[in-house]
Amino acid sequence: MTKVSVLSQTGASVGEIELNDAIFGIEPNEAVLFDAVVAQRASLRQGNHKVKNRSEVAGGGRKPWRQKGTGRARQGSIRSPQWRGGGIVFGPTPRSYSYKLPKKVRRLALKSALSAKVVEQNFLVLDALTLAAPKTKEFTKILKDLSLEKKSLFVTADLDENVALSARNIPGVTVLTANGINVLDLLGHEKVVFTKSAVEKVEEVLG
């Protein structure tokens, strides 16, 4: 099993934790990570694009002029696509871009993302993460003590409102619960910081 130092909020080492190699020590599968990121980004698309077809645009259904004898090209409706203001042919309509990956693939993607962070030495474990009150200044101090200057993802076992409120105004910092971790956020942050209890919860769910 891989051993990782456990840090306090002040950055001091307070012990070690053994990570489950079946979750944090596998060979990252880049193809699965790619599929997971594409699927998650697809589900974030709004899909509310819409244009009007010839049955929806303004204008009567009357034939604009008689078929023959005018010298002009024959026309059946001013709502035809070749007219200015006419309907669009085969235009976009509202749709959902989301699709689900198989459960085994989703689990493998999470394990691959977590293992990649451990291999890159961008995975930190805190003994605990608690704040007496929602104070952005206090959370900024924690970032400084842990030498976290780039985008950082904090993962707690359960929702802690004081922690979430303290971090929400800090650019590049995201706080999630262990049940809410996802591949896009794991890969989208330089550093990933788990509490000890969050590690145990993830190992329980993915183990």
UniProtKB/Swiss-Prot annotation:
Pfam family, one: Ribosomal_L4
Family assignment from sequence similarity: Belongs to the universal ribosomal protein uL4 family.
GO biological process, one term: translation
GO cellular component terms, A-Z: ribonucleoprotein complex; ribosome
Region (Disordered): 48-81
Protein name: Large ribosomal subunit protein uL4
Alphabetical list of SUPFAM superfamilies matching this protein: Ribosomal protein L4 (SSF52166)
Function: One of the primary rRNA binding proteins, this protein initially binds near the 5'-end of the 23S rRNA. It is important during the early stages of 50S assembly. It makes multiple contacts with different domains of the 23S rRNA in the assembled 50S subunit and ribosome.
Species this protein is from: Lysinibacillus sphaericus (strain C3-41)
Keyword tags: Ribonucleoprotein, Ribosomal protein, RNA-binding, rRNA-binding
Molecular functions (GO terms): rRNA binding; structural constituent of ribosome
Subunit structure: Part of the 50S ribosomal subunit.
Keyword rRNA-binding: yes
Gene responsible for this protein: rplD
